[in-house]
């Protein structure tokens, strides 16, 4: 999968080089002077974009001085393995984003409520936990084509902080970093992908483990303001690999507000069986 992502980037860079030889390209306004203290004027803002709802993040950052909220209203996951059924319910899984410069934004991503219930014939008495979830800090920079171009590349670093209560998570700080990319295809399609490394807690051990994620997908406008996407996600670590098929619909209510509904399906035994959720994004 990683070879696929790298090959995709190499091909897109070559194509973009040919495209850039156009003798009369549309000039891009210089926005390098704008910061959180000198916000980007509204008429110079780039098109609205979010890091939701697919597992692949956007390579674009929000404009300097802009505040944006992206949130799951509800998120329900079911996993059944070896006679044990685990149900997870998350409410208000919210990403607060602030544009720092024309090419960098800061994100604070708390889980306001998490409820897990474990049961099944191989488990015994059902156990339920609920409370505040973890908080993730993220810093994203755009490396290419933040304000135009077929190929866009970003870089995102993150740190999960164990703020959970009520035994809804582990108590380990978990860093990660990723390289998200997108490429505009003919007929209105967009190809998106990323490669990501996380340093995660290893269950029932004092050691950490490395997880490598490589989602890839396609998105397109369906009709009017309604668009959809399909994504294949895989993650490899010290245990069995995880694969899911992800899909969803996004409706652009206004130029600064979108809503979405999504369903992810496990393709491997080690993946959650079902994950359905709905949410929104809003740019102030």
Spell out what each predicted region is:
Residues 13-19:
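C-terminal segment of classical bacterial N-terminal signal peptides
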Residues 21-284:
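Transmembrane beta-barrel domains of Gram-negative outer membranes and organellar outer membranes
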């Amino acid at each position: 999968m990683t070879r696929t992502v790298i090959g995709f980037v190499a091909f897109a860079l070559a194509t973009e080089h040919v495209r850039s030889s156009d003798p009369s390209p549309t000039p891009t306004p210089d926005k390098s002077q704008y910061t959180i203290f000198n916000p980007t004027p509204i008429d110079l803002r780039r098109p609205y974009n979010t890091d939701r709802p697919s597992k692949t993040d956007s390579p674009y950052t929000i404009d300097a001085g802009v505040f944006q909220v992206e949130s799951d209203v509800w998120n329900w996951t079911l996993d059944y393995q070896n006679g044990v059924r685990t149900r997870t319910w998350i409410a208000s899984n919210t990403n607060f984003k602030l544009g720092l410069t024309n090419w960098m934004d800061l994100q604070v991503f708390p889980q306001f409520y998490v409820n897990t219930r474990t049961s099944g014939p191989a488990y015994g008495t059902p156990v339920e936990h609920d409370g505040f979830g973890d908080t993730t800090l993220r810093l994203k920079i755009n490396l290419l084509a933040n304000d135009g171009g077929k190929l866009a590349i970003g870089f995102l670093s993150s740190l999960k902080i164990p703020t959970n209560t009520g035994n809804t998570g582990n108590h380990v700080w978990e860093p990660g970093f990723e390289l998200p990319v997108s490429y505009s295809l003919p007929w209105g399609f967009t190809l998106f992908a990323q490669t990501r490394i996380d340093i995660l807690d290893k269950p029932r051990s004092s050691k950490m483990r490395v997880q490598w994620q490589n989602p890839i997908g396609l998105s397109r406008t369906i009709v009017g303001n309604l668009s959809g996407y399909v994504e294949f996600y895989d993650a490899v670590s010290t245990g069995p690999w995880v694969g899911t098929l992800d899909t969803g619909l996004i409706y652009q209510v206004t130029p600064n507000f979108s809503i979405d509904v999504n369903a992810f399906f496990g393709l491997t035994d080690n993946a959650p069986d079902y994950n359905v959720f709905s949410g929104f994004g809003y740019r102030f």
